[in-house]
């Protein structure tokens, strides 16, 4: 299908097949679609509501046009990349939980970018903490093999996205590109936890992950609006295991937490986000420790290392409080 035909189909309020969406996005990645046509495509798809097939097709195109690792990794990989954009201003919980997971022996290939709507994106906070995120492809792969943690800076691994950049910036609203980023880790991890900015996206994302063939994956959104597990409210999540999707809720009351200070997990600026992140790593933030441990616990659950998220939370919390995570991260950045 030619790009113009795909746009006309969307304008008629019809959804594209995965193949049609992939074809259009392949043209975009090669710089063969005009800014006007791409703008029309993104706007029409947004008005119709992105379908599973459309998101899947666009994801496949982004994956195919990404740089590929030269290394064959002989171990299971986890990514904790979320959509962001929940507008809540929390600390970088998914990034900090990735560090906790790596300190517990989980191989983490963290896919991320600079800030879009928050004070600090995953790349921003890691850089502030002393971890260099914009390195060579060879270094990124070596870090994973030798250290158990690496960061894939999205603009480096998805150079073809430069063709969509100006239109995305000019439009200024969420499009399918905000969805396919977390689904397009170039290392193709078979295990993934994704927080989404809207509850209705949980079903869409888990079905796309199912189609992509992941072994185990979890997509979550909390009832207080977070794109991660909340320590203050119930978190709903969809779960994929061996091709089967199930739906669940997690109530943090089961953890027995009380009198938590929300100010310990909400940042007012980039500098403040760094201060709060360091407090978590130094075991100086009660609420921050619980929030990061809970999300790391969910990661352990996705990896199949424990039977329940609660068990994972306890293990992750101990890693933070004992100083294990701090030592791991200090060793990590000392080798930079």
From Swiss-Prot:
<feature type="binding site">
    <location>
        <position position="82"/>
    </location>
    <ligand>
        <name>anthranilate 1</name>
    </ligand>
</feature>
<feature type="binding site">
    <location>
        <position position="113"/>
    </location>
    <ligand>
        <name>anthranilate 1</name>
    </ligand>
</feature>
<keyword id="KW-0028">Amino-acid biosynthesis</keyword>
<feature type="binding site">
    <location>
        <begin position="110"/>
        <end position="118"/>
    </location>
    <ligand>
        <name>5-phospho-alpha-D-ribose 1-diphosphate</name>
    </ligand>
</feature>
<feature type="binding site">
    <location>
        <begin position="85"/>
        <end position="86"/>
    </location>
    <ligand>
        <name>5-phospho-alpha-D-ribose 1-diphosphate</name>
    </ligand>
</feature>
<feature type="binding site">
    <location>
        <position position="228"/>
    </location>
    <ligand>
        <name>Mg(2+) 1</name>
    </ligand>
</feature>
<dbReference type="InterPro" id="IPR035902">
    <property type="entry name" value="Nuc_phospho_transferase"/>
</dbReference>
<comment type="pathway">
    <text>Amino-acid biosynthesis; L-tryptophan biosynthesis; L-tryptophan from chorismate: step 2/5.</text>
</comment>
<dbReference type="GO" id="GO:0004048">
    <property type="term" value="F:anthranilate phosphoribosyltransferase activity"/>
</dbReference>
<feature type="binding site">
    <location>
        <begin position="92"/>
        <end position="95"/>
    </location>
    <ligand>
        <name>5-phospho-alpha-D-ribose 1-diphosphate</name>
    </ligand>
</feature>
<dbReference type="InterPro" id="IPR036320">
    <property type="entry name" value="Glycosyl_Trfase_fam3_N_dom_sf"/>
</dbReference>
<comment type="subunit">
    <text>Homodimer.</text>
</comment>
<keyword id="KW-0460">Magnesium</keyword>
<keyword id="KW-0057">Aromatic amino acid biosynthesis</keyword>
<dbReference type="GO" id="GO:0005829">
    <property type="term" value="C:cytosol"/>
</dbReference>
<feature type="binding site">
    <location>
        <position position="90"/>
    </location>
    <ligand>
        <name>5-phospho-alpha-D-ribose 1-diphosphate</name>
    </ligand>
</feature>
<comment type="similarity">
    <text>Belongs to the anthranilate phosphoribosyltransferase family.</text>
</comment>
<feature type="binding site">
    <location>
        <position position="122"/>
    </location>
    <ligand>
        <name>5-phospho-alpha-D-ribose 1-diphosphate</name>
    </ligand>
</feature>
<keyword id="KW-0822">Tryptophan biosynthesis</keyword>
<feature type="binding site">
    <location>
        <position position="227"/>
    </location>
    <ligand>
        <name>Mg(2+) 2</name>
    </ligand>
</feature>
<protein>
    <recommendedName>
        <fullName>Anthranilate phosphoribosyltransferase</fullName>
        <ecNumber>2.4.2.18</ecNumber>
    </recommendedName>
</protein>
<comment type="function">
    <text>Catalyzes the transfer of the phosphoribosyl group of 5-phosphorylribose-1-pyrophosphate (PRPP) to anthranilate to yield N-(5'-phosphoribosyl)-anthranilate (PRA).</text>
</comment>
<keyword id="KW-0328">Glycosyltransferase</keyword>
<dbReference type="Pfam" id="PF00591">
    <property type="entry name" value="Glycos_transf_3"/>
</dbReference>
<dbReference type="GO" id="GO:0000162">
    <property type="term" value="P:L-tryptophan biosynthetic process"/>
</dbReference>
<feature type="binding site">
    <location>
        <position position="168"/>
    </location>
    <ligand>
        <name>anthranilate 2</name>
    </ligand>
</feature>
<dbReference type="Pfam" id="PF02885">
    <property type="entry name" value="Glycos_trans_3N"/>
</dbReference>
<dbReference type="GO" id="GO:0000287">
    <property type="term" value="F:magnesium ion binding"/>
</dbReference>
<dbReference type="InterPro" id="IPR005940">
    <property type="entry name" value="Anthranilate_Pribosyl_Tfrase"/>
</dbReference>
<keyword id="KW-0808">Transferase</keyword>
<dbReference type="InterPro" id="IPR017459">
    <property type="entry name" value="Glycosyl_Trfase_fam3_N_dom"/>
</dbReference>
<feature type="binding site">
    <location>
        <position position="94"/>
    </location>
    <ligand>
        <name>Mg(2+) 1</name>
    </ligand>
</feature>
<feature type="binding site">
    <location>
        <position position="228"/>
    </location>
    <ligand>
        <name>Mg(2+) 2</name>
    </ligand>
</feature>
<feature type="binding site">
    <location>
        <position position="82"/>
    </location>
    <ligand>
        <name>5-phospho-alpha-D-ribose 1-diphosphate</name>
    </ligand>
</feature>
<dbReference type="InterPro" id="IPR000312">
    <property type="entry name" value="Glycosyl_Trfase_fam3"/>
</dbReference>
<keyword id="KW-0479">Metal-binding</keyword>
